[in-house]
Amino acid sequence: HKKLGRLMWDYVGMARNEQGLKFVYEEIQTLKDLFYNDINIPGTQTFNPELEKAGRLGDFLELGQLMALDALDRNESCGGHFREEYQTEENEAKRNDDDYAYVSAWEYNQDINKSQLHKENLDFKEVKLTSRSYK
């Protein structure tokens, strides 16, 4: 879990880039392969807190990889998610409201590579979309 946490912190944090996201996606896949192929859970067949911890780690591995996939899919900077490739000359976030004005949810299909992105477009009637400057 520490390795996963470090990978997420280093590559899927607030500032990220395509190269790092692709790297972390593959690194998490390697961790998942190790985890699912070499897992050894101590304990008995009664209540086993180690089994519970292993289940949570499996979930965290899947979620971390999905977060990297989602960040790769979003080719813009927006809010607290800064893609280094998408910034203005003043190093401000460069949004792409034409392509990314939606809310989304990923459907997991037992394999991260078969996950399906569902989108619901946002219709701004009362508010006009504008970019903010933090300078």
Located regions from the model:
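Glycine- and aromatic-enriched mobile tails/lids
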Residues: 1-135
